[in-house]
């Protein structure tokens, strides 16, 4: 009799992906650390996250607990997170982090623009007028002159701060 190409009943039909115990522990630790970051967030921010009811309640409980109870609760959060897809949660957390870093970058750009207005005067003010046509050219010139006088007299940089506030308001108005 000819033997057909049949698999023996003990041979699996699909390929099994083998994962080491160390890799599994590393993944679990990563989920627990993600849970810790969620516990550190304010409740108003947490409401915006795509969390299951169990996970949301576990996080709220962990925020109340202290010391050893909190450590155990964090382990429980890690366990609950194994049954949840962590990618949407991680994406929302990254979005919040990037929002803060992006705001910091914008403020640094405004500070550099303010420094240019004080140092270069009319040339930098013209650039500001191109970016923000609703800006008050006369007020910016006046503040730039005052800032230079304050700098020469070693006085506090009140006018520079005011220029920064004007630029910030113009930026927020966009």
Swiss-Prot record:
It is found in: Cytoplasm. The keyword Cytoplasm applies. Pfam families: DarP (PF04751). Its main location: cytoplasm. PANTHER family: UPF0307 PROTEIN YJGA. Belongs to the DarP family. This is Dual-action ribosomal maturation protein DarP. The lineage of its organism: Bacteria, Pseudomonadati, Pseudomonadota, Gammaproteobacteria, Vibrionales.
């Amino acid at each position: 009799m000819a033997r057909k190409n049949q698999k023996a009943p003990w041979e699996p039909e699909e390929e099994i992906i083998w994962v080491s115990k160390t890799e599994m522990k590393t993944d679990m630790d990563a989920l627990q650390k993600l849970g810790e970051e969620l516990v550190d967030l304010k409740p108003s921010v947490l409401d915006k996250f795509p969390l299951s009811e169990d996970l949301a309640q576990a996080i709220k409980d962990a925020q109340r607990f202290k010391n050893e109870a909190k450590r155990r609760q964090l382990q429980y959060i890690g366990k609950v997170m194994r049954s949840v897809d962590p990618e949407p949660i991680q994406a929302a957390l990254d979005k919040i982090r990037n929002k803060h870093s992006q705001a910091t970058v914008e403020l640094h750009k405004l500070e550099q623009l303010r420094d240019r207005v004080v140092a270069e005067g009319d040339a930098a003010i013209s650039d500001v007028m191109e970016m923000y046509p609703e800006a008050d050219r006369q007020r910016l010139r006046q503040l730039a002159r005052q800032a230079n006088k304050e700098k020469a007299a070693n006085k506090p940089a009140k006018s520079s701060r005011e220029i920064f506030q004007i630029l910030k308001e113009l930026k927020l108005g966009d």
